[in-house]
Structures are given as C-alpha cells and as structure tokens.
Amino acid sequence: MKRIFITFILYLLVLSSVFAQKLTIESFKLSENDISAQTQPRKDLNDRNCALVKVQFVGTISEVEGNVVKPLGNHGNETWVYMPQGSRQLKLLTQSYLPVMVTFADYGVEKLESNRTYVVVITKPMSSVG
C-alpha cells in the first residue's frame, strides 16, 4: 500500500511539471537601429510618444499586463507592446505556460525611453523525449 502511495505521488509530481512549464527570457535589449517606435508611434495618456517592446515568441501571447498602451500589435511571431516612458516591467501571459515577468533592470535597462524600440526574446522549454 505504501509503495502504491509513493508511486502515485511521484506520478503527480511528474504530471504537474509537464503542465506547468516555464518560458525562458533569452534576452532583453535596446534595438539601436530599429526606428519602429518613431515611424509607427503611439501616444500615452500624457500625449507623449511611447517606447515599443517587440516580444519575439513562437506561440500565442494571450495578454500583456503592466503599464501597456493597448491594443497589442501582432506581426507574425512578434507582438508589439507600446509602453509609456519610464516603464520598468511587463508580464506576459501565454496559452500553455506559466506567466513570465520581465523586469527590465535585470537586463541592464533601468526604465524605458520614449521613441525607443526594445526587443525581448522568449523561448519555450526543451521537450524531453523519453
């Protein structure tokens, strides 16, 4: 009986790790040569141009939380997120993975600047074939 209970617990642990997979933030950086935030600007509530964060992710981003000026822009595997100057983080929600919090200071960007384009690359976990 004890053996069955331990096997059941191990099965639940493995099952939960399969369904609660985490995405990885590969990089977040200022894209010096990308002028999309200037050529396709969006204004915040104070009538100032926003910063543009391009989220590169192969999959569906269902929602973005934080100081976001909506609507989001979908460009293939890239989601364009406009954020006011001074924003410090954003939270990405996807269909099949745990939410991802991107804190810009962790990648050397204290806060976003107006009219600048940033790129964040998000990757899925490697699937284990057993």
Predicted regions and their residues:
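Short loop/turn and low-complexity linker motifs enriched in small/turn-promoting residues
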Residues: 21-130
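Bacterial N-terminal signal peptides
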Residues: 7-16
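Positively charged n-region of N-terminal signal peptides that target proteins for export
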Residues: 1-4
